[in-house]
Design a protein with these regions (language model features):
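Juxtamembrane/disordered regions of integral membrane proteins
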Residues: 2-151
Length: 151
């Protein structure tokens, strides 16, 4: 394999890893976020059926793909890219758990920062610590998926 083919293969793996990680983080984050919001509706004494949960989850996946997905994609791609550059320059080993840590911390910081800058809760599920931690978990899962594909 010549150096050009090797570089092309490496770039494809990087792009695929980032894409898989972003989609995984978004899907899990959207689904968990919907369930957090529905749990708070249920805590007010309203009944939420499984059919309503499935409907709301599907609606949110579609609706949030225009708002949450682009924000997560931009932030995660930039942070994972910076992580890759730093680790390459330091000649340090990378692992799926490192990408998970970076992704989780990134999303954990993202929502409060957006709230502070825009003076509004961008994603209702992150109004509570539990909701924010579910989103960080989604970012960590996306990072783990990214790392598994990348390495």
């Amino acid at each position: 394999m010549n150096p050009r083919q090797n570089l092309d293969k490496q770039m494809l793996r990087i792009i695929t890893g980032y894409a898989v990680g972003i989609v995984a983080a978004f899907l899990l984050g959207s689904m968990l976020g919907t369930q957090v919001v529905l749990a708070s509706v249920q805590s007010m004494g309203l009944e939420v059926s499984w059919a309503a949960r499935v409907d709301a989850t599907l609606d949110d996946l579609l609706g949030l793909s225009a708002t949450l997905l682009p924000v997560m994609a931009l932030v995660l791609a930039v942070v994972w890219g910076l992580y890759d550059v730093i680790m390459t320059r330091m000649r340090s080993a990378r692992g799926p758990y490192h990408y998970a840590l970076v992704g989780g911390l990134c999303i954990l910081a993202l929502h409060p920062l957006l709230g502070a800058v825009l003076d509004v809760d961008v994603f209702a599920a992150t109004r509570s610590w539990f909701g924010l931690l579910t989103q960080a978990t989604a970012g960590a899962f996306g990072g783990w998926c990214c790392g598994r594909v990348r390495i």
